[in-house]
Amino acid sequence: MPKKVMIVEDNELNLKLFTDLLAAHKFIVEGVKDGRLALEQAKMFAPDLVIMDIQLPHVSGLDLIEAMQKDAALKSIPVLAVTAYAGKGDEDRIMAAGARGYLSKPVSVMKFLEAVNGILG
């Protein structure tokens, strides 16, 4: 059975790139552009993995990761965080919030797929 991946990404180009790449590798993909909808969408879609942009309008991806960890229905879903604004200490904060993996943009296709497959096993 194909794995389900939800992508929370406000940038349409990145969302399309991640979606097309994962779909080409036989994943079932759901995209969410508005982070405010991410938690409810995750409950409905029940993904095996969430790919979370950290810099989102209206809500921080970091806050969403922390909220997922506090929600009984979502805390077991692994999160791969991606961000264009990788500063000193960001990876530590993101991993401490509960992310299972971290990538800084721009992300190479190979590193992205390795990270996804590494988390999903």
Question: What does each model-identified segment do?
Answer:
Residues 19, 63, 86-103, 111-114:
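Alpha4 helix (beta4-alpha4-beta5 surface) of REC/receiver domains from two-component response regulators
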Residues 16-24:
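Charged docking surfaces used in two-component/phosphorelay signaling
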Residues 57, 66, 75, 87:
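The feature encodes the CheY-like receiver
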Residues 9:
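Conserved acidic carboxylate
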Residues 13, 34-37, 60-66, 111:
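Acidic catalytic/metal-coordinating carboxylates
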Residues 45-51, 56:
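Active-site beta3 strand of CheY-like receiver
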Residues 26-33, 41, 103:
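Short hydrophobic/Thr-rich beta-strand motif most characteristic of the beta2 strand and flanking loop
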